[in-house]
């Protein structure tokens, strides 16, 4: 049975922080949005990969976790009644007369005047270590992200890797876990020097262990890990006890169907102009980590700025005969009414 076509003003692809803030900025100029995301919840990488990891560079928030930021954004956009389509990936994007039609892999069909791509780096999957039978342990005692740190309280945790994620989670989980062992193939790290310094201080104090080597084999039953075999730099092997293993070898980013939509691309990113954040296709915008332009910084706050400018241009497509008068939320009674504060 064919699903009925949904009609709206704007389609936002991606429900990460930048996509969520786009709902807010579009709402201020009377543009209603439907949001599509391949994940099962809002937040993007913030909630999927580091929901409890602290973020320090959001203006006005000294410290906030990925989950907290997502919750605040979801609360902020409530007045605009955005509709979400989770667990769906956009498969096709077609141009119509005066707009676009998007079809997802769940056969949802949405038509809108503008499309906003806020899909981060595209779809992402953690890089899986090439270990025999690792899939038997995944989701039970091998994890690529931390949803709730409390679930690791009192556990013997082995963290594998030498980048920022490995070091950050070593530091964040140290007060929670029974023991933390950081394993890396060499003594040099690809992480922030301050994090490396803090980690080495914990090693010196005996609060965590650091070992050199690579995991070659997993040991356990019914998906529950109890130890791993490690091959050291000298070729000798040893067993490392572990109830939980967390490998951080980076992410594999895939642009996915976006690459087939006829947009100009540059190194798997979407070039935009910095006045409107419009792509090479009129009416299609790209904001956040998926876009590129001279001086681009991949920061959440940069994406917020891009969303604000995008909304001003999107208004011209949704309301071509209506001039947009710029207003401030602090002084505009009409904007305050939309936000439900007046």
Positions of PLM-derived features:
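Predominantly flavin-linked oxidoreductase catalytic cores and closely associated redox partners
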Residues: 95-97, 108-204, 210
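A conserved FAD-binding loop/helix module that cradles the flavin
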Residues: 167-169, 290-336
């Amino acid at each position: 049975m064919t699903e009925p076509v949904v009609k709206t003003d704007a389609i936002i692809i991606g429900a990460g922080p930048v996509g969520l803030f786009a709902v807010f900025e579009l709402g201020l100029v009377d543009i209603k949005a439907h949001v599509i995301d391949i994940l099962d919840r809002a937040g993007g990488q913030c909630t999927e990969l580091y929901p409890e990891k602290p973020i320090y560079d959001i203006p006005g928030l000294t410290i906030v976790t990925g989950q907290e930021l997502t919750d605040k954004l979801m609360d902020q956009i409530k007045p605009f009644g955005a509709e979400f389509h989770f667990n769906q990936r956009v498969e096709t994007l077609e141009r119509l007369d005066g707009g676009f039609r998007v079809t997802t892999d769940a056969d949802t069909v949405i038509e809108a005047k503008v499309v906003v791509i806020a899909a981060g780096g595209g779809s992402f999957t953690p890089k899986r270590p090439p270990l025999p039978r690792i899939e038997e342990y995944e989701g039970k005692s091998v994890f690529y992200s931390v949803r709730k740190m409390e679930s690791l309280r009192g556990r013997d945790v082995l963290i594998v890797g030498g980048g920022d994620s490995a070091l950050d989670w070593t530091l964040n989980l140290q007060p929670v876990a029974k023991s933390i062992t950081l394993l890396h193939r060499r003594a040099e790290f690809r992480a922030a020097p301050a994090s490396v310094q803090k980690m080495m201080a914990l090693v010196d104090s005996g609060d965590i262990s650091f070992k050199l080597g690579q995991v070659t084999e997993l040991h356990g039953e019914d998906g529950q890990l109890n130890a791993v075999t490690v091959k050291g730099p000298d070729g000798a092997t040893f067993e490392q006890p572990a109830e939980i293993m967390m490998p951080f070898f980076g992410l594999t980013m895939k642009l996915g169907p976006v690459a087939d939509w006829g947009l100009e691309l540059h190194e798997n990113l979407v070039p935009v102009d910095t006045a409107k954040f419009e792509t090479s296709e009129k009416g299609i915008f790209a904001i956040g980590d998926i876009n590129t332009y001279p001086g681009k910084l991949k920061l959440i706050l940069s994406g917020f700025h891009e969303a604000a400018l995008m909304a001003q241009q999107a208004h011209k497509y949704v309301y071509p005969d209506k001039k947009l008068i710029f207003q401030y939320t602090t002084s505009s009674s009409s904007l305050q009414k939309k936000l439900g504060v007046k």
